[in-house]
Amino acid sequence: EVRVENFRATVPSSKSKLEFTGVGEGGISTCDLILDLRGGTPLFSAHEKRDGYFRPDPANPGAVAEALFTLSDMTGEFEKPRYVDYDAGICAHSSSRITGCTKCLDVCPTGAIEPNGDKVKYDPYICAGCGLCAVVCPTGAAKYSLPAGDSLSDRLRAVLGTYTKAGGETPVLLVHDDTFGRDIIALSARHGRGLPGHVLPFTVNQATQVGLDTVLHALALGAVQVAILLPPSKRADRDTLLAEFEIIDTITDGLGYGKGRVVLIEPDEPDQLEAALYVDALGAMPTGDVVGMGRKRSILRLGLDTLHRNAPIQPEEIALPAGAPFGKVEIDTEGCTLCLACVGACPTGALKDNENMPQLSFAEDSCVQCGLCKNTCPEKVISLEPRLSFRDEARSHQVVKEEEPFLCIRCGKPFATHASLNHLTQKLSGHAMFQGGDRLDRIKMCDDCRVVQMTVNDDNPLAHGTVPIPRTTDDYLREREELRAKAKQDMKDKGITDGEA
């Protein structure tokens, strides 16, 4: 839907140029195709990614003609694929209006994603299918749906497995799209040296859809390097990919494989592509048969475990850069009151309580470093530490803090924790409603006993004074007569008569 200012109808008899009639008014047009010849600010952000929006340079007749011919061929009905499958159940965007992860909102170039309560909402008609949201999503709530299911992982296993069984060594996986990437590889094969023998082309829908899970899976299958061939139309997205590749470099370097296992190639000509590929191959990687099934976190863990198991160096943990989807939650147990607000906010179940006693436990393998627990904590005792742990205890919940339940001082029923009651008592000790008597002790009673104590105790902080009896005219007249009688009696006692001065 496009709103147009000064909208006027054209004169059918216009000859040398278009003429318009009537008075300019606001108009609304619902259309599938837009040809923008204003030469000014585009109507949309990331306009080059919008389907059906053409914005050629009005000073270039050739570009305008090409756009017109392209538009004239766009007749009939078209199907637009849904590029992203979104699972709101594991989204870490926010909880109780407290914001956590905003990665997909930050990287979407077209504005197809917007907040929707505690979750986000995708507009499939605006989405251009770049896949960046799925790349940065820490939980896998956003999953790229082309290809569907686990077919991408199956293709990786088939390509690298077949190459290895045939005796191939040091395979380099060249990831490219089906347009620019395919064409530049074809030009290199026809007019240049083509691809080196150990470079395996791997076609995907968009080169920008490849993230941590795909790269680590390929390395675990034996690829010595993953090269992403980025077309010119995607150069604006390079920073997002480089941030993800920094995490991979940190992991592979920490395991002894060295850096540079994933690279970004941005050629404009076939010669530049060949120059980037005809280099000395990196050292061999261990070959494993990793079946990439399930969502993102499962594939990541399978790939990481394989790489760690066969690594030259096998550290127990690796420090990661900020923003990594792995890490630990540091909790100051002295300041923690076991209110368990963090448990309710955690979208992945990394933080868990115990229904039988006041207890907080944490599973590092499930943590995505979204920050919801940190932002929700009322005591501000939680901090995040991005790291990758290979310890066995990281895979299960470990107790962070536990206490024996506090018993009601009146009936003995367990109803709270010592830490929370001590904190509450300290906060309310100076409050006027809890001064004197046993008012402060009511905090240490369960809900039932607290009501009973306030009912039977005369020291009620909410009680008001005695209500005065309303006075009437008769009351005032009676008081007047009583005062007169008293005055006469006083005069009589003093020996004063009514006639004396």
Segments and roles (model prediction):
Residues 50-53, 188-192, 240-246, 463:
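Short secondary-structure boundary/capping segments
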Residues 119-130, 331-336, 359-369, 397-398, ...:
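Flexible gly/pro/ser-rich segments immediately N-terminal to CXXCH heme-c attachment motifs
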Residues 90, 121-126, 204, 232-237, ...:
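Conserved short loop/turn motifs at secondary-structure junctions
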Residues 107-140, 341, 345-348, 357-376:
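Basic (Lys/Arg-enriched) interaction patch that binds polyanionic ligands
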Residues 66-71, 89, 132-217, 221-222, ...:
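Flanking helices and flexible, charged tails adjoining ferredoxin-like Fe-S electron-transfer domains
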Residues 1-107, 111, 170-183, 202, ...:
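Ferredoxin-type iron-sulfur electron-transfer modules and their immediate structural context
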Residues 214-222, 226-264, 269:
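Cofactor-cradling patches in redox/metallo enzymes
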Residues 116-157, 235-245, 261-266:
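Terminal amphipathic helices with adjacent charged low-complexity linkers/tails
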